[in-house]
């Protein structure tokens, strides 16, 4: 049987002790985790909007007292406000159009720059391929101990030794093979 992964505050295995007295000690894992229900914020917002949208008692009294005169004044004020809002909306839409045009220009410039860089990389790679004749003899031909075998290789070894290039070096980081490998493959 497995445990319930809860600490045993009073171990109950073994013989039952008559003098066993349970204590009032409680572990945090034995307590309930949640005691309140959480509500979504959207419901609170909807409730707040409903409360705000209902006309207050003061507004109702004011309408009854002042009558139609103030209502007509309010309508005139709202009409002027709506014309101001229309002008502001036009200005905002013009500003948005200008910003969109600038954004499109910036995007186009970035695209052109990327294309130029890619073309430059491609042409550079093609130039390297043309200028450097690819002579791939394998990695064994460059190693010190991989040159054993044929007479032609022994002749090439003596040529390397006379140049001072193919000498055996005890330190691998100082060997010509290592230097050539780093030059070719690590940039």
Curated annotation (Swiss-Prot):
Cell location: Nucleus
Compositional bias of kind Basic and acidic residues: 49-60
Acidic residues composition bias: residue spans: 82-100
GO terms for biological process, alphabetical: mRNA cis splicing, via spliceosome; mRNA splicing, via spliceosome
Residue ranges of coiled coil: 72-131
Entry annotated with the keyword Secreted: no
One Gene Ontology cellular component: catalytic step 2 spliceosome
Disordered: region residues: 33-100, 124-146
Chief place where the protein resides: nucleus
Domain of life the protein comes from: Eukaryota
Listed GO MF terms: RNA binding
Keywords: Coiled coil, mRNA processing, mRNA splicing, Nucleus, Spliceosome
InterPro entries for this protein: Cwf_Cwc_15 (IPR006973)
Family: Belongs to the CWC15 family.
Assembly, per entry: Associated with the spliceosome.
Function: Involved in pre-mRNA splicing.
Protein name in UniProt: Pre-mRNA-splicing factor CWC15
Classification of source organism: Eukaryota, Fungi, Dikarya, Ascomycota, Saccharomycotina
Gene: CWC15
């Amino acid at each position: 049987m497995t445990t319930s992964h809860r600490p045993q505050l009073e171990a109950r295995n073994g013989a039952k002790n008559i003098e066993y007295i349970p204590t009032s000690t409680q572990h945090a894992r034995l307590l309930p985790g949640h005691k309140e229900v959480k509500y979504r914020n959207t419901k609170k917002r909807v409730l707040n909007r409903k409360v705000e949208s209902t006309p207050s008692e003061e507004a109702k009294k004011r309408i009854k007292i002042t009558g139609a005169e103030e209502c007509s004044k309010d309508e005139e004020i709202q009409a002027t406000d709506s014309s101001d809002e229309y002008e502001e909306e036009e200005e905002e839409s013009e500003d948005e159009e200008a910003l969109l045009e600038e954004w499109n220009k910036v995007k186009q410039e970035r695209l052109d720059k990327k294309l130029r860089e890619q073309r430059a990389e491609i042409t550079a790679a093609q130039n390297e391929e043309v200028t450097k004749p690819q002579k791939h003899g394998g990695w064994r031909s460059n190693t010190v101990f991989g040159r054993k075998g044929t007479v032609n290789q022994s002749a090439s070894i003596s040529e390397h030794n006379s140049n001072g290039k193919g000498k055996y070096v005890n330190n691998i980081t100082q060997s010509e093979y290592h230097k050539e490998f780093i030059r070719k493959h690590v940039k």
